[in-house]
């Protein structure tokens, strides 16, 4: 009798959370898996942060369309071919999930960086600014970002 009661409770509780099994239509990837996915040149890299955030550093080859702007969907459809996979990132992963949902709804195949640009940095992945690779110390944004070609100037001889 006790087993039946417990099983009833478990069944009832599991029915309260159907969204856990719901397909969101896009894939959320770790920084390592995202890096592998965007190595494919057919994948379009989309950074959905603000223009200011993007200018401070971004993933190589990314284009910037701010998801918080009212014309995001219009700019996305005018810029992004539906025949390509779109790899979306933002700062922490929240805006990229929102953008991924919007893009998926209008017919795009989408992957998104689950941990966002912060996770990308923490994983020690390459970051670019003004077309040049930059180095961020300790995997975190520093007040002063040092370009890789300037590191020798910092070495005490």
Predicted regions: what is each one?
Residues 2-5, 19-43, 52-85, 96-157:
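Rhodanese-like catalytic fold shared by cysteine-dependent sulfurtransferases
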Residues 89:
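Short, surface-exposed ligand- or partner-binding patches at beta-edge/loop junctions that are enriched
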